Amino acid sequence: MESVPDLQNTMYAAVDGYPCVRLLNLSGSIGCSNPGRDKVVAPIVRFENVDKLAEPSAILVISDDSSIASKVGGVLVEPRIDLQNNLKGFSPDQKFPQAQFAPYYNTSYEWNPIGSGIMWKSYGFPVFLLTESGSKTLQEFVAKNEDKKKAYTSKVAEFDLVMQTVKSGTHDSESCLKEATCLPLGGYSVWSSLPPINISSLQQPKPILLTVASMDSASFFRDKSLGADSPISGLIALLAAVDALSYVDGLGDLSKQLVFAVFTGEAWGYLGSRRFLEELDMHSDAVRGLNHTLIETVIEIGSVGKGLSQGVKNFFAHTEGDSSATNQTLVALKRAQESLPSENIKIASASASNPGIPPSSLMTFLEKNPSISGLVLEDFDSAFVNKFYHSHLDDLCELVHAVGIIFFFLLDLSFYMINAANVNSSAVVAAASLIARTLYMLASEIEDVQDSTLASINVNASLVKQLMGCLLDCDPGLSCELVKKYISPMSSCPSHYVGVILDEPSSTPFTGYINDVPRFIWNFLSDRTSIPRENNISGCQQGCKGRDEVCIKAEADGKGVCVLSTTRYVPAYSTRLKFESGVWNVLPPNSSDKMGVADPIWTESNWNSIGIRVYTVQNASYDRLVLLGGITLTIFAYLAIATARAILSKAMKRD
């Protein structure tokens, strides 16, 4: 050892994990945090019996005993691949996610029957999901601790999950925003038109066919939110459909304008779609070229990754709104299915017994305009088939891959086994093909589009597999060639948590404030929907000259390319928030805006650092024993000295 850092590395071992963090709304908080201003230090034990816990401990637990909660110092959730029991799934969300925003009254309906709702509760102790390497480190410490039960040392875990809102005593969104101890959940959505919209044209603007998908998911653990089936399979299908349509000639001659939007923040009160409509009302630069009165039909691509069953790709059309336009969409969807005979696709209308459309961005548009025509394409009918909705387990897993999760939630242990991949690429390809051909038929307004024309609209299956590898896995993850063609990712492992909005919202935000995924989507859509500029050799270091031009691939090669594209970022944050003089202010609710009244206004607590480390400490009982021994020894020494002095004094007097 040559330095203090070397000594620290010898004494302490960092443990990798994904934290559950503190989120706040207008009425309180959810999520996890250290209970006070200090780090939590607790011995690591593998729980067997609550009566054996004599002090707050960091536990590796297999239990359903809620009485343990009062003795918990912290929770370590251990991923396992060796437990293969009968499983029913796991979803920490509600049985009707975001029911308060539904455009109908039956909010007791269970779209997500397996939902436990645990992610919407507040916990006064830290909780971490360990990575595989973190689990290995911790298991070694646990094994050593159990092997040395008679030793006077123990292994402890130190949780650094101190939230600024807990330290400052700001326990709701309004107070923490005033004290600057939190930031609003949000980010940037992306929209693009195909072909680009000529804003300076004097011609009558075309009706708009708006196709939407979501790019954000949620889970109990902040940075483990892949959302493979829900909703990223729909996002991938949308990107693949845009790619397929970009090769079709004559799109500018169609009767309707194709517009695509990818929203973020939908898992937290439909932040992206609500702000998108708000920006349309304000005619802001972020939506320049669009007019909400021209939006004729909204088609949403929801969860489509689990549509494959026994070789058949099954999808369900959930519809709402104007019957004639909706019927046209259903007819086009059916025709698209018939044009793909070799794909073995089945389309069915959702059950009439459903209370309405499932949780989706379309709810926002219906609240704004109840007469708008809308359709949501899903891989389920009356209830989610994704058994891991808004769970860290909704990932891209291999076929016949078993997963056992030791997860206690005051305290609920669930084991899960996945018998098939969460997302099937052929199902995503089928959904993308249906959407691409349906959009072409609706935009052309030709009753009998030639089969040869539809046959020319083909989805690139290799692109779908690429996107799945890039957006749903860490290997290659965002380090894949497709993503690196456009941006320089900050991390290779994708996470689809919405994050927080860091500065004043803008239609031209600083790219450092935008997450990797929306930056990639913006570049991808700009590229696929663009018209290249002639003689574009010099790049765009000095900016693009044309008003409707954008610079793509600048992060990747430092030069970039100017292209003509109507692709924009749109801020995504609560419509009840306003940024003024560097401060976020909460606006009073508008009684005419049902969704605004229901908006919880989600914020995320600030923190200085988050982490876990483990190390060895000497037991307090041993310290007390040493102290007692020292005191006893001192007393005996004193008595011995006093006795010796007395004896010596008597002896000297006799002399």
Tell me what each language-model feature is:
Residues 1-655:
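Secretory-pathway/membrane protein signature
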